[in-house]
Amino acid sequence: MTNPLKGEGGLKALGKTWTLKLPFAEAQRLKSELGVDLINDGASMADLDKFDGVLLAMLRKAHPDATPEVALEILDEVGMKPVIDAMQPALAAFLGVSVEELKKGGERPQ
């Protein structure tokens, strides 16, 4: 069960519920391995060739056995919009803003 108050998003796909969360270590990995800088260039996470990597990073905390193939299967089954919606609580908690601010494209914390 997901808890948005703890920065968790939930997504139903592949016959189960997936919990998405973005620990700092995963954000560091995204920047070093994929060049996705969530603090200074959040739009970089939407690149099609990187989006599955962002999803995988958010899955790893609750689902350490998740693989790149699982991330792609989830995207194939539900599409990007439900995944983006599920990512929002995790991304907002990581950035230290509310989901509403994130949706409005609010200022990034300094």
PLM regions: where:
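Short, isolated positions in well-ordered beta-strands
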Residues: 18-20
